[in-house]
């Protein structure tokens, strides 16, 4: 799972452990803390705010280690593709009202896990990366010159690590 998908992967592995042999996490978000519900109407306002073009552009740039070199119109379009989906705003508002992902480290079991994180991840931040690095069961790999998207910032290296992990 990538980013919040990492929390989803951990929860799924906890719920159906016999169906999962290994997990790969890419810059997993939501491992620490407690869920914090954002009540109506703040959840709706927040979802609308996150749909603003300047906010989308800023979030997209934060995801990359070197945004001046890596972020163009195509990356901004990809980061905003969900805005074209019917119901995206209400779905995001509902997710915010639910409390989102937090504290999912409690789902870490004895399933092998490898975790790739960019050392320049400005979404998770240095404190979160340090906390992730300190969870022994996560088999942490820190990637230099990489942001929140190892599979995009360093696709060849990330795919090699992932392939080697699943073939071992």
Where on the chain are the PLM-derived regions?
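Post-His helix in hydrolase/transferase enzymes
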Residues: 152-164
